[in-house]
Amino acid sequence: MKNCISRRSFLKAAGILGAAGALAACGGSSSTSTAASSTASSAAASAASTGASIKLWTYPIGGWGNDDTVQNLISSFNAKYPDIKVTVEYLDYTNGDDQVNTAIEGGSAPDLVMEGPERLVANWGAKGVMAPLNDLWTDDAKKDIYASVESACHNDKGDYYEYPLCMTAHCMAVNMTKVKEVGADQYIDTDKHTWSTDGFLKTVDALYKGGYENVAAIYCSGQGGDQGTRAIINNMYGGTFTDAAHTKYTADSAENIKAIQALYDAKGVNFDPSINGGEEITLFRNGTLQMAFCWNIAQQLNADTAAAGQTISGDEIFPMAFPTESGDPKLCGGIWGFGIFDNGDEAKIKAAKTFIEFIAADPSQVKDSVLASTYFPVRTSVGDIYAGNEVMSEYSKFMGYLGDYYQITPGWTTARTEWWNMLQRVGSGEAVETAVKTFVDNANAAAAAEA
């Protein structure tokens, strides 16, 4: 078995930080999950939906996981629609899916949920529990929203189950202070934030030989932050996670097998079944790890435990695209927006659509809604909302590296579980070819069953 960071060591390290800020799509909060609720309401009448009361459940999508931020947005909504009462519950990526699924099974699903197409379209939409949003997708909306985003928000029948608000590119990060210390910055194009696969492996080796035993972790305790482990493996030698038509999973390709084997063989890279993406971020911030595969602009801006862009000891955190042989990285994209659960109440569905239209489409509001997320707009009409912001302008370079949004492939929920199980088996010494075959067989069986 490859070395891993023991759970005791992780907890000891994490104790230094307290509640570390692991944000959207990277494992949620590293502290114990508790759902907080809050309400915004007004006694005035609304022409849109008199007396309607709706529930919004949101994952921690940048500032959309912060109650003060969300309440300010709801206050803006209530200024225009004062009679629609909005109750908010905050989820995380550790227990959020279980909470939603339990609510669905118990007939108490929220009216609105904020997350991405992999949940709203490929999961809950495919299960028939979401209300179609086709009427919100007007011709003007389709012209304004990026085509790559629009295509991810509907199923193969053309039914839309997500109305998007914001997007970003997931990347990785390195402790640049330590990289420079061992002379490995020569392998990094700091202007483009890119490097070759050979340069990446040489950097890992230099850090390991420089005394940093734990350079990076292939975290695999669960699905939290799994976009990072998929991306490092797919990018290294040009592999893909699915076919272009999003009908089957392709992790058993020669390119992917080569990448997994290279990571397994690399000294300093540990397959660790005791941590997820959020916990990897904690270990990166406190200096236990020198690289993080679970990263995006929300992490770069996070200042909960140290100054933004720094580790807890003050080292420079430098965001990077994943390494490639071709020089053309393909980053996983995050798309976030709103979906409506069909609870059989047309008045609530109407009120929920009114909320979506205001927050995600109203020209007077949408900029503030996106800014709250700390991500980027999906609408061309919104323009450059970060003009003059050096950090955001620099990070916008990653948007040009966005790859295929394959998270809407049938069988996605099963594939995510099979993925971290596969990585655990590799870490335990199972042959890579055997492990990926099991993954592909099980994931594709699920895809065929849902097609």
Task: Please annotate each region the language model reported.
Residues 90-99, 118, 194-199, 273-286:
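Short helix-initiation/N-cap motifs at beta->coil->alpha
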Residues 52, 75, 79-80, 85, ...:
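Extracytoplasmic/periplasmic substrate-recognition and gating elements
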Residues 201-208, 245-275:
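Glycine-centered hinge/linker elements that transmit conformational signals in sensory
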Residues 363-366, 373-383, 399-451:
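Conserved C-terminal helix/tail region of periplasmic/extracytoplasmic solute-binding proteins
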Residues 157-165, 170, 196-248, 289:
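Extracytoplasmic/periplasmic solute-binding protein
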Residues 132-145, 189-193, 216-219, 239-258, ...:
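Short, solvent-exposed loop/beta-turn-alpha elements that line the ligand-binding surface or hinge
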Residues 2-6, 11-122, 127, 138-142, ...:
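Conserved N-terminal structural module of periplasmic/extracytoplasmic solute-binding proteins
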Residues 45-48, 116-171, 198, 314-323, ...:
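Hinge/lid segment of periplasmic solute-binding proteins
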